[in-house]
Amino acid sequence: MKNPKFTENQKEIEKEEFEFLQKLNFIIKESLELFNTNLKNSMKFINYITLPIIMASIESKSFNPFSEIIEKHIAFILNSKMNSLGYKFLPLGYSSDLTYENDNSIIHIDIKTANLENPSDFKDTVPLGINQSSYPGVLDCKIRGKNIKADCKKIKVYPNIPTTYNNKLTITNALLFIYPDYKEIIDEIREDYIAIRELISINLKDILTPIEGSLEEFLNYKPSNEKKRLEPILDNIVRGYFIHDKLRHEFSENVEKDLEEFEKKIIGIAKKLKEREIKPVAILSISIPNGELAPHYDDEIVSGKSWGSSFRYHYKKSGNSVFKGLDNKASRAVFLHINKEYLPVLKKYFDPITVYELTEKRL
């Protein structure tokens, strides 16, 4: 069944979305030099966050300071530039990373980062939470690998964001920053770090003295939803020794020697991270359709990784990364920056590549 034609109201919504996308693209494009300068300044202190990165590498969750640094610098730029364009900063609960208001609209901007080695996070799609879109997502009610399916046509993934706030149009955008992988650098020291934790664990008696009862029983005590007491003790000893220069000379001479050797390795890893220049290889600006544009984007906006509570906007599905209701068929997904060194890699994942300059062009 073919989708109905766009109504005049839907065309007006697409026009406003397109006009704001142009404004956002201009802001980021003209601020790239400032962004790179600020990012370079943050990277001067990479040696101070190298150990936490190493520590997180053995956890199920990964501490990615580069995502956080990028997000904060972009937030700083947008907050100043948006104000100059007449948009007031408007913190809202259940909203995107940044929200703004003017006389006609409420703007949601989500800042996303993706590792170049994880194309599922950026290739032709952008993951969205229920606070990052006003468009209901299609719910696929089946279990993979099993002959179990339900008819969910009447149920969709409904977001927390409304299509309007007090008659002001909701406009949602995503800025996606793709950065180079650095996993192999951390892999060089991961096993050494595990060995250091084991070394400290074996020699805990040097700095941890039992007062009453069994020390081993205390260290193995595990309250529900927490780690064994041993784990945070080791974490704190590592941070105390290598970050705060505490607990020095508390261990035996042989243990101290191994700790000092590991410290030299941390310095070496910090140097390699700095040389990698972990800055965006590409910046992609994406306009996410307003929910009032349904059903025109139903094929592209579906339930995401967290089934029933997230979305994926497949902005390139069937080649339709455009404002469907506009005559100019401008792209909803535009590159604001590409490191030419990575262009051959990016072309494997994006075809065509639409770049924002003063006009759009294809590489």
Swiss-Prot record:
<protein>
    <recommendedName>
        <fullName>Type II restriction enzyme MwoI</fullName>
        <ecNumber>3.1.21.4</ecNumber>
    </recommendedName>
</protein>
<keyword id="KW-0540">Nuclease</keyword>
<dbReference type="GO" id="GO:0009307">
    <property type="term" value="P:DNA restriction-modification system"/>
</dbReference>
<keyword id="KW-0255">Endonuclease</keyword>
<keyword id="KW-0378">Hydrolase</keyword>
<dbReference type="GO" id="GO:0009036">
    <property type="term" value="F:type II site-specific deoxyribonuclease activity"/>
</dbReference>
<keyword id="KW-0680">Restriction system</keyword>
